[in-house]
């Protein structure tokens, strides 16, 4: 009897090895044999779990960048996913008219229904873009500027109070600037996309109160955004995981799932409240109102479900990316010798002395400010991962970078790596150096894709540029800053987010 009990246990090891052989090795030699000549980490060539692990570690950018350093510009980072660190093929993968489609990676980011960001169907994306695109046109930015000014004024009140009342022995007050910039951008985006600010800036807290069908509720919005971003990037590497997240023994996945549920609840509550209580005529047209006015090719507006999806897209894309870039920009400007003083000199000359918050018109064409913003976008690369594209299934494949890729192959260009290529940006590519934009080359312009490229590029670029320039100009002109902590730890989800940026501030004399 004991012999029959032991025998099944003895067979477990060989059965496990046989299972692994059929699950990983056979597909490697058969399904993806056309990619066998492309180098990459062995585990990445065999399994999707290499990239899942890199994302789970919140360091995908580092794993992929290290792989390119070791294996070259064309690297397999999944069995059917090739990463190409070559600026010359950006248009071939992301440009107009090439037939490339978004991959299943984007399914992991769907919270309610497909949005303009997550939609993979070309016709559906075109319909959504027609409804939404006018809302982000340059002429719309004039209507959005008062919202930025209003919340920036509250931000200054908070920082002025800290500078006046919490100064240390050296005259500088300690500030964790990343979280305050996050509060600021959250209230701006909340006001624009949901019809009212979240109130996090005034409270100095990430907890947002809202009404649901069951009564009053609250949630930590920054935490929810961060965990949702991390889970979307991780599950995007293996979308088959999504239905099982809430049962995962790993708290990382359960927390990310809860973040998605939190955001869905918040978005539904805020949009429902806005539709039931429309604003008066005295309020400037916000982003939500402009999207509501939009019409598709058949003259139809978005329904409530699509409004929620698009508002959440603006919240997620517009908050994490912009606030992370602002925090990294502040860190490098304060940390890099001479940059803050040079920026302050330009701002002092351009902005009248009695103006606390400059208009976008005052700062949009300032040369050095533009260099600083561009260098922050390049050096930090908030969106650092390669946005995956699928070679169309109904064609003959494509030849890119000297390789032929069969239909169904996933391709991407790692933005962080391309933004740090020494053959493009020079031997000082890893340094923060705004002056490099003084004589930027055509090759560098081609390699600079902080908002992606082509028909699926970020629609919010104009809004992000206005926020970055107006907000940076405001704090840089108003305060002197010193570093309190010279390190800046990075956590990556869909965006590379500084964990904290600790500085000292004081009002300028």
From Swiss-Prot:
Heme binds at residue 458. GO terms for cellular component: membrane. The chain crosses the membrane at residues 6-26. The keyword S-adenosyl-L-methionine does not apply. Its main location: membrane. It is a single-pass membrane protein. Keywords: Heme, Iron, Membrane, Metal-binding, Monooxygenase, Oxidoreductase, Transmembrane, Transmembrane helix. Gene3D superfamilies: Cytochrome P450 (1.10.630.10). Induction: Highly expressed under trichothecene-producing conditions. Pathway: Mycotoxin biosynthesis. One of its GO terms (molecular function) is monooxygenase activity. Disruption phenotype: Results in the loss of butelonide production. Belongs to the cytochrome P450 family. Cytochrome P450 monooxygenase FG08079; part of the gene cluster that mediates the biosynthesis of butenolide, a mycotoxin that shows antibiotic activity but does not seem to play a major role in the spread of head blight in wheat. Butenolide is derived from glutamic acid via a 4-acetamido-2-butenoic acid intermediate. This is Cytochrome P450 monooxygenase FG08079. It comes from Gibberella zeae (strain ATCC MYA-4620 / CBS 123657 / FGSC 9075 / NRRL 31084 / PH-1) (Wheat head blight fungus).
């Amino acid at each position: 009897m004991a012999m029959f009990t032991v025998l099944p246990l003895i067979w477990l090891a060989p059965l496990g090895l046989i299972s692994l052989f059929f699950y990983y090795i056979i597909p490697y030699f058969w399904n993806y044999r056309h990619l066998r000549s492309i180098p990459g980490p062995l585990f990445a060539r065999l399994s999707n779990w290499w990239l899942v692990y890199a994302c789970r570690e919140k360091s995908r950018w580092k794993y992929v960048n290290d792989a390119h350093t070791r294996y070259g510009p064309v690297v397999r980072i999944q069995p059917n996913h090739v990463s190409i660190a070559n600026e010359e093929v950006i248009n071939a993968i992301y440009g107009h008219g090439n037939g490339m489609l978004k991959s299943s990676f984007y399914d992991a980011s769907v919270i309610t229904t497909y949005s303009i960001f997550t939609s993979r169907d070309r016709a559906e994306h075109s319909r959504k873009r027609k409804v939404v695109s006018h809302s982000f046109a340059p002429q719309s930015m004039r209507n959005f500027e008062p919202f930025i000014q209003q919340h920036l004024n509250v931000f200054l009140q908070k920082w002025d109070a800290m500078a006046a009342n919490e100064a240390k022995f050296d005259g500088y007050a300690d500030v964790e600037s990343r979280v305050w910039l996050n509060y600021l951008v959250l209230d701006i985006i909340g006001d624009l996309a949901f019809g009212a600010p979240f109130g996090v800036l005034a409270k100095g807290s990430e907890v947002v109160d809202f009404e649901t069908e069951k009564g009053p509720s609250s949630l930590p919005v920054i935490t929810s955004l961060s965990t949702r971003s991390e889970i979307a990037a991780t599950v995007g590497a293996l979308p088959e995981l999504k239905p099982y997240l809430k049962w995962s023994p790993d708290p990382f996945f359960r927390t990310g799932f809860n973040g998605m549920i939190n955001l869905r609840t918040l978005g539904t509550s805020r949009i429902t409240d806005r539709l039931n209580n429309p604003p008066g005529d005295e309020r400037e047209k916000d982003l939500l109102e402009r999207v509501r006015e939009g019409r598709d090719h058949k003259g139809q507006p978005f329904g409530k479900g699509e409004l929620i999806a698009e508002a959440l897209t603006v919240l997620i894309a517009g908050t994490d990316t912009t606030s992370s870039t602002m925090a990294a920009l502040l860190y490098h400007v304060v940390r890099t010798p001479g940059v803050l003083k040079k920026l302050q000199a330009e701002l002092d000359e351009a902005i009248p002395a009695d103006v606390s918050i400059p208009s976008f018109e005052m700062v949009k064409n300032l040369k050095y400010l533009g260099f600083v913003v561009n260098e922050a976008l390049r050096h930090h690369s908030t969106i650092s991962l390669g946005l995956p594209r699928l070679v169309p299934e109904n064609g003959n494949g494509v030849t890119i970078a000297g390789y032929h890729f069969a239909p169904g192959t996933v391709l991407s260009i790692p933005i962080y790596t391309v933004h740090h290529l020494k053959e493009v940006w020079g031997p000082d590519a890893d340094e923060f150096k705004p002056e490099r934009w003084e004589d930027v080359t055509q090759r560098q312009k081609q390699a600079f894709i902080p908002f992606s490229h082509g028909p699926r590029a970020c629609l919010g670029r104009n809004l992000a540029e206005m926020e970055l320039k107006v907000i940076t100009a405001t704090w840089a002109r108003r305060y002197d800053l010193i570093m309190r902590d010279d390190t800046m730890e990075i956590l990556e989800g869909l965006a590379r987010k500084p964990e904290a940026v600790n500085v000292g501030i004081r009002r300028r004399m």
